[in-house]
A protein has these predicted regions:
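Catalytic cores of secreted/periplasmic lytic hydrolases that degrade extracellular macromolecules
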Residues: 2-103, 108, 112-216
Length: 216
């Protein structure tokens, strides 16, 4: 009968023990690294969950739309700021539109809130409707429906909300959304002047982006 080799057994056991603890150490290190130094995907997921929680909390507060009153250009800008702040409370960060862009376009389209459509229809952006049954105004001098009208809103802040929704959802502004997302992914501030260039579908005016930019 062969003699049992205890030395070989002890050597093999010690080798496997070292391997076990080495693997265990790697697992612990990986766990610690992943816990205290999460990757970008983990950070993004946490931020997304926080945004959802934050949005739900804000909605539960049932905030009321701010009053939109003004007598001059400065007051118009202040009223716009209050309205945009109110809208942003209910929007995730990646769905927001720069203040300068919204105010610049509203100022251009509504003559700083002094246009007929702004005063009578609360429409600050000249947004149209092609549905005759939708509340609307016809252009000055037009008495019959010609296939479109300027949409009427319950309030001026309501028209701002509609404008933001339009940029966030309409297929015509896909390039705007893509550029905004690129800026967000690079942790850059949203560049209103660059984003305005993606509004070419909003108006048939060739230099529309330049006109909006001059209002900023």
């Amino acid at each position: 009968m062969a003699k049992f080799n205890w030395d070989k057994l002890l050597h093999t056991s010690w080798l496997y023990t070292k391997i076990f603890f080495a693997v265990l150490a790697l697992c612990v290190a990986s766990y610690v690294y992943g816990t205290y130094k999460p990757n970008e995907s983990a950070i993004s997921k946490v931020n997304e969950e926080l945004d959802i929680f934050y949005m739900n909390e804000i909605k539960a507060m049932d905030l009321q739309e701010p009053e939109f009153t003004y007598n001059n250009d400065i007051q118009f800008v202040r009223a716009m700021h209050k309205c945009i702040n109110f809208i942003n409370f209910t929007l995730p960060k990646d769905k927001r539109v720069p203040y300068e862009m919204i105010i610049g376009q509203a100022a251009l389209e509504s003559a700083w809130g002094q246009s007929r459509f702004a005063k009578e229809a609360n429409n600050l952006f000249g947004i149209r409707t092609w549905n005759k049954d939708t509340p609307h105004l016809l252009p000055q001098g037009v008495t019959k429906w010609r296939g479109w009208g300027v949409k009427s809103f319950a309030s001026k802040c309501d028209s701002v909300q509609y404008y933001v929704d339009l940029l966030n959802n309409h297929s015509a502004y896909k390039e705007f959304r893509e550029l905004r997302q690129k800026m967000i992914d690079k942790n850059q501030m949203l560049d209103a002047l660059q984003l305005i260039k993606k509004l070419d579908k909003f108006s048939t005016t060739k230099d529309y982006d330049a006109r909006v930019a001059r209002m900023i």
